[in-house]
Amino acid sequence: MLIPKEVKSAISQLRKNNFEAYIVGGCVRDLLRGAAAQDKALGEPRPAEAGREPEDWDLTTNAKPEQISKIFPRSFIDNKFGTVTVLTNSKNPKLKEIEITPYRIDEKYTDKRHPDSVKWAKNIKEDLARRDFTINAMALDIKSEIRSLKPETNSKFQTLNSKFILIDPFDGQRDLRNKIIRAVGKPEKRFSEDALRMMRAVRFATIFGFEVEKMTREAIKKNAPWIQAISKERIRDELIKIIMADRAADGIELLRKLGLLRYILPELEEGYKISQNKHHIYDCYEHSILSLKYAAKRNFNKYVKVAALLHDIAKPRVKRGEGLDATFYGHEILGAKMTAQILNRLKFPKKEIEKISKLVRYHLFYYNVDEVSESSVRRLVRQVGPENMDELLQVRMADRIGSGVPKAEPYKLRHLRYVTERVSQDPISVKMLKTTGNDVMKILKTKPGPKVGQILDVLLGIVLSDPKKNKREFLEKEIKKLGKLPEKELKDLAQESRKGREKLETKRDGMTKKKYWVT
């Protein structure tokens, strides 16, 4: 993998001014993961969990913020920790900005969120010691151009014609190879500095498919209540990253096992061990997790995934009775209200709250091919919003698989898709014309009657054959011509036009049926 020229240039500039400079943190982790996967695959396509190009590039140096700014005139200091954002001329969005942070040591964390103050560290190892996990506490010292990384030793890596040194005082490379999430130093101290790190441990384990090391796990279990000190916005952002991961269901379950879920989504944990009825083989919590698992497998969007996780959130509160005949009447109505409350608590945007709540509210819609009319489908589309119908059906699919049924989209759901598209299509009618019955009467100086409708029918037939002719000027000329035709001839033309329209409607309906494999 090539180190981008923008990154190498920034390192070079710092070194020319007699400062140290290293690539650091998550981008080193991603570089090593990508190289390891590539080396293992021997040129074959890399697996989904393989490393990827870093989302951003972070550098660290022994230069102070003012010194960095002097070296890079197109830069600004953007926080109290001395991070300097350097602007580049790169066309790559990921490289338009490069963050350079001085070596630092974080002082006491009173609020378990941010250091009360920072002081500059003497060397790179002191800086790495303040970081969260060993896999993020590595730095890369570029000695010359790097073409690929091959992590097979502890300190040096050889490439075809260049070399570099990995600064790895906490054995992050070993943990990376062994797929371990381990806190740097004492886990409890790391989490007391920033309690959100407990969620980050879950997020990294979820995204990478890693295990959380025992001492790190125990520290999270012991100190899970600390997460309450974190702002809801930061919790929301971490939660969404977990939900959007391929292994989202595993991530939510890990939050529960580590004792974090009760402080993040206590309503979801209420469903743990709450049995359902004859229509379900899983308890309320398991059903929600499995619904999310299917949504993740199908790569549905964020709204569907959140709705899949929360769609039965109210079941524990409305449950009546036990065993096979237990009921959950109204859970979709209360569930929509609870979903709105949860998302509002987590500071989701208002539009997202409305959309996801609506998906929860209507996820239980009733549809049987021979029992539900088109007017009922129109009403559902109107209530949910045509823009949300696909997502509602996806939530229903996730709900079905989460219930243990073998088929996500049975015939009746495909048929509903067909009817939904059919009722949402613009009808083929004279309303499509760029003229009206009033125009016909005005041009021909006539009164309302069959002749007006016949002329509009003929005009529609002309426009359906050639949509470009649906222009007011052309239609006015045609109205004058048609107005001169004998009554019978005009009547026959109108009838022929209506037959053509019916054929077109039948053809369109047939294509829609074929699209959804229904009859």
Positions of predicted regions on the chain:
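Catalytic cores of the polymerase beta-like nucleotidyltransferase superfamily
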Residues: 1-519
